[in-house]
């Protein structure tokens, strides 16, 4: 696999606290990579090391196969969780200032900013001071500033914080569009539904250690609990009776009022030694079977189980 970024055995301590302990990970080029973990796990420390804001005590970070340098940081667009716009400056003036710092000519910066401001519907903000903007409005501006110079690696730390659902969805779509245009995105968040929507791969850090890494779909499949959702038409007693000796019957996946009007549902876990085909055959003999699907755990469930040590 072609990796744009590799971290090898990164460790970092602060005044007796081990923020990162021998963390290694590889980020595939052209992916959205989720960096997950509870508060204080070490995610922000890792991001700061990648951006060369702080240095690791040991280990190395490679960008395109070689040790990352200060000059490489220009290839990175970083949107920190702590937003950092100058409140007294006008929006347009400030956006051009940061674009110039990132190597864009003034004319090119103005041209690209015009396109982004039109895309986000914020043309009227150009001459407004940042202090006049709401948190969500300022966040839109900082997102544009982060991506304007077309960095090959983007790092977003809790990018949806402060956004309403409509603007959060807009930002998700733009992140995926940036990936599709060739950028690699590191995405740090606590929002597991967003992880399922946009992340291709993840690493989960807990108590300074990397405890889980891989492709999102593969991780979800790997940690399934052999639970199946059955939808059927027919007598509930017949459905339960035909599988009672073969399966653990669990609570239905939704309250009865939310079930489809023409189907009933069950959650089943086959007993040890019982094959799925036996369960399907038994159900087919008792009711009209309409669906039989493995229940894949959500990333939220996997996160909780991994952090609690029950995965």
Where are these regions (language model features)?
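Residue-level recognition of well-ordered beta-strand positions that form the cores
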Residues: 8, 26, 231-233
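Generic beta-strand hydrophobic packing signal
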Residues: 8-10, 292
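Non-catalytic surface loops within mature trypsin-like serine protease
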Residues: 29, 124, 234, 270-272, ...
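A generic structural signal for secondary-structure junctions
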Residues: 64, 94, 103, 142, ...
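ABC transporter nucleotide-binding domain
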Residues: 173-270
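C-terminal coupling/interaction segments
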Residues: 271-311
